[in-house]
Structures are given as C-alpha cells and as structure tokens.
Amino acid sequence: MKRNLMFKVLLMLMVGCFLSIDAFAQQMTVKGLVKDTTGEPIIGANVVVKGTTNGTITDFDGNFQLNANKGDIIVISFIGYQSQEVPAAPSLNILLKDDSQMLQDVVVIGYGTVKKNDATGSVTAIKAEEKNKGLTVSPQDMIAGKVAGVNVATSTGQPGGGSAIRIRGGSSLTASNDPLIVIDGVVMSSGSVEGLSNPLSSVNPTDIESFTVLKDASATAIYGSRASNGVIIITTKKGKTGSVKINYSGNVSVSTRKNKIDVMTGDEYRDFIINNPNATEAMITAVNLYPGVNTDWQDEVMRTAVSTEHNISAYGSVKDYLPYRVSFGYTNQNGILKTSNFERYTGSVSLTPKFFDDHLNMNLNAKGIYIKNQFADTGAVVGAVSFDPTKPVKNDNNKFGGYFTWTTDNDPNGTKASSAGVNPVSLLEMTDDQSKVKSFIGNAQFDYKVHFLPDLRLNLNVGMDYTKSDGDKYVDPSAPGSYGEDPLKSGSNYLYFYERRNTLLDFYAQYSKDFAKQHFDVMAGYSYQKYHYESNKETWYLSRNEENFGEKTSMNGDQQPAESQYVLLSFYGRLNYTAWDKYLLTFTLRDDASSRFAKNNRWGLFPSVALGWKMNEEAFLKKFKDLSELKLRLGWGITGQQDIQQGDYPYMSFWRYGQGGAMYPIYDESGNVKWVNVVSPSASSPDLKWEQTTTYNVGIDYGFFNNRINGSADFYIRDTKDLINAEVNVPAGTDFAEYVVANIGSLKNTGFEFAINAKPIVSSTWNWDLGFNVAWNKTEITKLDYNDNSDSPGKRFESTGGDGGKTIKIHSVGYAPGTYYVFEQVYDKNGNPMEGVYVDRNGDGEVTEKDLYQYHKPTADVIMGFNSKVSYKNWDFGFNGRASIGNYNYNGIAANAAIGTSAIFSNSALSNQPKAAFNTNFQGRQRQSDYYIQNASFLKIDNITLGYSFENFLQGAKYHGLSGRLYATVQNPITITPYDGLDPEVDGGMDRQVYPRPISVLFGVNINF
C-alpha cells in the first residue's frame, strides 16, 4: 500500500515537472521599440498582453520589455494613434499610425459638421463620456463647470427644477438672455412652462450623445436673430449596425437638508420675550400659551427624500440597412421640502436608414416626455424661519384644519389675525399643487448625395416641438393662509393650461470640392419656423360649508385666455475654405425676418467671418515634435435678438378694456342709460427693431505631447446696441401709456476664457484625467433711455419684499446690469452697523433716496470649473467642482430680521427671528442697507464618484457575458463661502425664499447585456 502511494506521488511530481518545463518553454521575454510614422520614438505608449493586466509603458527611447507566453497577443496603444495587436515575439518593432478618426473628429455646428481641427469659431464639444456624473435629472446638470465661459446656476432644490444658463454673461437687459437650444436639428421654443423648466428638460439625459456650445458670433451667426446669447446644440444617441445590444442604467438616491438657518428654539424664545424689557403683557401671554413646546419648524417642513431612476435602451440594425435605437426612462424624484415630487416618463425612437448605395441618408427622431409635478409652497421655507417655535404644529381647534393659527386676541373662535405669519406646515399639507406636462420633439431629416454630382448634397429637415402643461392648484377652504370669513369665498382653486407648438422646415444645399491642396465647402439654405402659443388661467373661490365643502362657488376675477403666434423666415449661407490644410476661412450670412417687428424693421442681416491659422503645420514649428496643435483663430460677427418678453406684437396698438371693469354711460333720446365697456388703445412701438450684438474674438487652440495636454484661450469683446427696454419713459400725451417698449440702450461685454485638459498618467493600469477652465467677464451698460445725462440714476427694479414696494436693483450707465442700489451703512467705532444711520453721499445735509448708490452686482467676475478622474484597473474615482468669484447676494432673510417689539409682535401674533438679528440689534428692518449685500463667492464640489467597471460577467460558452459599471456618488457635498445664507448660489442674487439644494448620496449601476 505504501509502495503504491509512493509511486503515485513520484508520478505526479514527474508530470508536474514536465508541465513546468513545457510552460517555461512557452514563456518568453518580449522586447520592442515603438515609433510613429516619422521614425520618432513614442514615449509612454501602453503595451499590454491582451485579456490580462500584464503590461508596461515605453520609456523615453520608445523601448519596452515584458513577459508573455507563446500565442499571446500584444496590444500597443497611445493617444492620437491607431492601436495595434501583434503576436508575442522576442523582438518587436512597432509603427503606430496617426488616428485619422481623432484627427478628423467632427463637431456639430449650425446646419452641418466640421472637423474639430478645422473649426474657426469658439466651439466646445462635450461627448457622452465627458459629461458630469451623478444625479443628472436635467441635461444642464451634465455641463456645469465643463465649458469655459458657460455659467449654469442651479439655485433651487425643487425636484425637476431647472437652471439659468448664461454664455459669456448674456447680452440683453429685458429681452431673453437664454442661449438658443437646438436638439437634433430642431430649434426649440424659448422659455419655460409650469412644470418644464426650460427646453433642455425635454430630453432624457441618458439619451444624449454630445453637447456642442457655440460661443462667438463667427460660430453662432448662422442662427442669426436668435444667437446673441450663444447656441447649445444637442445630438442624441443613434442606432449602430450590428446585432441588438441592450443597456440598463438605474440608481437610487437619498437626499437630505445640508444646513439650516440658525433661529431661536422654543425655550430660547420664551426667555427672550419674558426677559425683554419692552415686552407687553399680550406678548408674554402669547408666548406662554403652550408651555414646554419646542417646535423646530425647519425640521417640520423638511424630510429625508428617496428617489429612483431607471433607463433601458436597445440599439442595433435590421439587415445592416436600418440602424435603430429605442429607449425608455422613468424618474421619481422626491424633494426634501415635504410634498414636493417630480415624476417623469420618457421614450425615444431613432431610425437612420440608408438607401441607393448610401446616397440617401435618413435621420428620423421622436422623443416624448410625460411629467407629473407636485409642487411645494416655497413660502414654507421662510415661514419655518419666522414662525413662533413655542407653538405646536396642530392644536385642538379644527377651525383651520387643526393647524395652529394666530387669531385675534388669541381667541380660539376668533378670526385669523391679519398680517400674522401662516403655519408653514399648513402651507404644504393643505395645498395640492399639481401640473402635468406632455412634450414631444420629432423630426425627419433627408440627406441626399446627388448621384450624378456626388460633391453636392441636398438636405431637408422638417420637425416640430410641442408642449402642453395642465395645472391645478387647490388650497383647502380651511387652510389658514386663505381662510375667508365669507364661507363661500374661502380657499382657492387655480386652474391653468399652456400649450405651445413650434413647426420647422429647413432646406439647404451643400457643395464640397477639393482642388489640389484647397478645399471649398459652400452651403446655402432656407428656413421657415412658426410658433403658436395658447393659454388660459382662472381662479375660483371655494365653499367652506359642510354640505358642499370644497366645491367651486364663484370666480375670483376674470378668465385670462391668451393666444398668439409669430413666424421667422430666413435665408442663410456659409463658405468654408481651407488652403494647404493650414489656412482657414469661414464666412456666414443670414437674413432673418420676424413677424414681431413692423414691416420697415422686419428683416435683419447677420454676417460673420472667421480666419484660422494652423501654425503647427508651418515649417518653422515642425521641428517641435511635442507640439501637437497650435491654431490661431480670429472672428467677427453680428447676431440678433427678437425674444422680446413683452408679447409678440409690441409694435402694434391693441384695444383693451378699461381697468377695474370701467364702463361709460350712453343715454338715448328718452334719457335711458346704457352702460358700455370702456376700451382704450395700448401703447405701441412701431419703430421697434432687432437688438444687434457685434462680437470680436481672438482665440488659440493648443495641444502638446500628442494632445495629452490640450486646451484653448479666447479673448472677446461684445457690443450690443438697440437694447430692447421694456419701460422707456415717454413725455406725457405722446402715447397711450407712460412707458413703451423701445430700442434705447447699449451694453458692452469684455472677457477672457482659458481651458486646459491633461492626461498626466496613461498606462495599462493607471490613468489620470484632469480638466480646468476659468473665465473672466465684465458687462457694462453704456447707454440707457433717451437721455444719458438726465437726473435719473437709471431703471430701478426688484422689490425688497417690504417697505411699500421699494426696490433694491438698478440698471445704470457705467455699471453692470442689475447692480444693487442701496444706502451706505454707517458703523460705530466697534465696527457694528448703526440702525437707520447712512452716509449722506450728496452732502445736502439729509439722507434721502438721492443718497442711494450703486454697490456690487449679483453676477460673478470670474467663474471656474475643474474635474479629476483617476482609474486603476477596474476602479475609478473622480470629482467635479466649480468656483464663482465676485458675485454678491441680497440676503433677504437677514434683511427681514429685527428684534424690536414691532418686528416680533403684530396683531396678537409673535414671530421668531434668525439669531443673526442679534449681530445688529436692529429694532426695525433696514432692508435698503448695503449691510445685507453680502459676498457670495463660493467654491463647490458638485459630486464625488467612486466606480467599478466589469466585463464578461456570467460569460459562458454561448453567452458573451455582461459588462457595466457600479458606482456611488455624493452630490453637493462641499461648499466653501463667506456668505451667511443657506446657499450662495442664487440666480439673480435675491435670496428670499429659496428652495435649498440638498446633499445626496446615490448608488447606481450601468449594465450592457
């Protein structure tokens, strides 16, 4: 037995020995040299055994060495070159060719594409893999901080809430400053509807393939009258030839409040009132109504919110000639403010068939979206700060739905105390505010390469953009905030609908030809676009009687039906010329007509010209082998603006009913009276015309080390004239109103942008990508109103929210739009602000409104974006951040705080105050003090993501397995700012009752089947 066992052991050892010898014989040391087509060694090229993590990189001489087995495949790759796969051998000489796809990478521009290397305008393209990760409910979330000069300000945490997008600071005062949005060739309607924040929200972010941002006029002028504020072009994902492939992505997120306003607790508030020497007996009685109650109202209106998202798509082709892609998505996002919710269903279909030997290419797209919104009253955010913390959420009195409500003399059976704060929880729970939105974007594009003249292409695009929003806001008749003493006029029901329809027809012909070393590309086209809007609003009183509780009784005011339409007609063309692949010329011209202007001003001509010089192609720079790209760009162009915001036909006068139902008596011969409605004409502006913006741009695109380091720098000057002003004073008696809409004004933008992207580490196991961009912008009004030398300081606007409608902002010549207009605060020797004491700036011996002055602005001087991603084998870690410098907010919550008895007690009701009020000890509110204009510069980390990628999971003999990625993200984790409010990022700078942005933790998965 022992001999048999020993024999078996010896046999196994011998077999193992032979196997080891065989394996050793199969293994080899692979040495090699990697060069480019010019014979130069390539430093840092990846060399890896295919299907393994066994790899290395080339040294400074292009050499490499690694161990491999006979039969292994060696993969050699480097940025900017085509990868090669070769069998393992002891000695290898590898020649990598330039990656023509990368060199000829195209970007989408207006009515066509251009090779990235040949672009002459200020154009930035972001591909799908470069977009921000994390919680991206709306497409604008993907590009925040990614593009130099583009500011995406998300100032609300409302589920589904949108962002204000500004490219190079905007170019208008009262007309729109939003960029033009183009989705798959459809120029979108501007503006928002209730429940759909902006045109970008019409697309599921997971369906987006790329963003292209056109910034200067040489790039945007092809869109003419709508391109003064830049253009964002979105291209969605298409089908691909081959078998069907299915992708699923989903995530679950948990969101919570990031911080809150520091206010007095119930016990602190009792002590404050009881120990206040100015407290009245009524105040002490009121604060002791509910002994021991400590209600944190901010906790009562906020919650931890759980949200989910699911997306599935399938793409492939039918018999190689009909590529397709279909997708479906579902999002359910709960807000941290109670009762708020955003639910969205999306679907898209894309077909890209080809016919006649690829001479006819079709691009058929359809995208649908259905949204259900549950809005929360954001007044509850401020109400939670100021409501008395010694009172319970509910009491035994069912008169107001059981919610504690201040009544006259605190009599449970009394009427609601006038001017008293409303229970913030009741604002949320006794209001049902919903909207349902349906949106559709579709187009059919036909691109025909003429058979007998293949250099000529004919392109026809027909499309539409349709949106309808139906809203129903129901406020319970017992709700404290709308409780009416008349039981038939209590509560409210606000009903509305809004429908817009945008139809489009574009046709252009394009001829491209190469002559020796010259390339010509000429395009000319025609566009017709019609916009139609229709809406209606009505508000009803409700019954509080038991027998018909909640039913409509009578209308509060009149119905407000509205319907309008306008048409844009355009002819456009473009010439691209390239000589010796070094010298570039682009010329565009667009002639636009808008029905929004009178016939004599209807047409506007918008030209542009741009020059490019690929300096790295010159002989004197060819010797610098590490210089991949150096291109100088010069651009000039004129763009327009016709998005007036004051109706579609301000040049016309309309007859309208008199205010307040005014009527006029008419008597017949018998003396009988007949009352008729008074009508009068509205003001008109027959000379109203386009805003025109002229832009000068100088830029450089650069790249080093085969574009491992690349970026751009731009300097621009943008002059806008004929600014459309909504309220231009006119002399009495010259029109039917005190103000008209007119072209009186101009402004100037000056700015600089810089962007850099780098790959510091590129290896078979480690990779590191870095990105940084910074932009400086200065905007100044250079002319305003009829007379720049008048005594008027400018156009004042933006109410403080109190003080009888006093304003806090102004448009003034020599200053940025919307500069704050305030009193200069005086401070005591200890640096504390003195209540009601301001600087007499004009020296007339008294402080009046003539002493108000321009002080800071809500827009930033400098904005920055940065990102980093490190990957090791299958793991990746990255973050994205932004910074804003020089922007100031009006802290309306602090400005509304005071500790005097008149501020905290009114008509039997007490109100809490932020503890910041004790920093000033102001007894009354000083809303126009510059003390409340606070530095809101910030540094934010928008998201931090850790991911793990996998492939060949569950692989079998007949199944290729699954590939995908698991990831975890923290959204909005870090904010560094000197600002005292909840969040420094406030669109427009007015921080009064903002829905706070939460901090979110997200877990997600992306799987390819």
Language-model features, listed with the residues they occupy:
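Short, small/polar-rich motifs associated with maturation and membrane association
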Residues: M1-F355, L360-I369, D377, G414, ...
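Short aromatic-centered micro-motifs
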Residues: V47, I76, I181, V826-Y827, ...
